Amino acid sequence: LSWQTASAQAHANFNVDSLEYIMPNFSIGTVLFYNGERSQALLNINTFDNAVRFIDEKKDTLIVKNEEEIKAVYIKNRYFAKWQKKYVELLNPTNDTSVGIHRYINAIAKKNVVGAYGMASETASVSSLSHISDMGNTYKLKKGGAFDLSYHEVFYICKGSKIYPANTRNFQKIYPKLKEKISVFVKENDIDFSNLESIKMLYDYCIENQ
């Protein structure tokens, strides 16, 4: 099976600038609304607030006003389904099933511990910043403050318009005829549902044996 690149990154040392958006650049895309309407623009999806951004005629970057009415987004042949206020990318649609991935960054304010000579001694974190700049809005903490940033990828198994967290039970729900075989395959291959390559192995097995 042919898989799209999921842009998977190591969670421990990631580049905040490169992961602020799902796409590397704003690209022509289409927003599909629940009422059937479509809008086309230069689009991207922000990983901090999980909202669609677009660039208007004045080259300003804006948030889609009626975000709650979005059903799906297409950007450069990549499809993102809206599910529970998240954008889940369908990586490899095969018939009516697919593996999905949701990417996001958590930003948590933290307190610095004052060390020798009055210098801040930061507690361990994935990544630290003194401020976060988001489309012209800069969020700052008090003097000496910082953010703990962590990049996350959550995986799903999708069928039609249904999206389920990737786990043994939900794979069995999608492929009921393979229920026992899935249990054996997961155990024998030590399937890790927090790892995309591992999930792809199980998905490919199900597609080939359904």
Where are the predicted features?
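Short alpha-helical interface patches
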Residues: I22, E67-K85, T168-E180, K187
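N-terminal secretory signal peptides
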Residues: H11-T61
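Short hydrophobic/aromatic-rich motifs at helix boundaries and adjacent loops
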Residues: L1-S2, M23, E153-Y156
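Aromatic-patch recognition
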Residues: S39-I163
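A short, solvent-exposed beta-edge/loop patch
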Residues: Y139-C206
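Bacterial Sec-dependent N-terminal signal peptides
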Residues: L1-A12, L202
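Short acidic/polar alpha-helix capping motifs at helix-coil junctions
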Residues: W3, N15, A146-S150
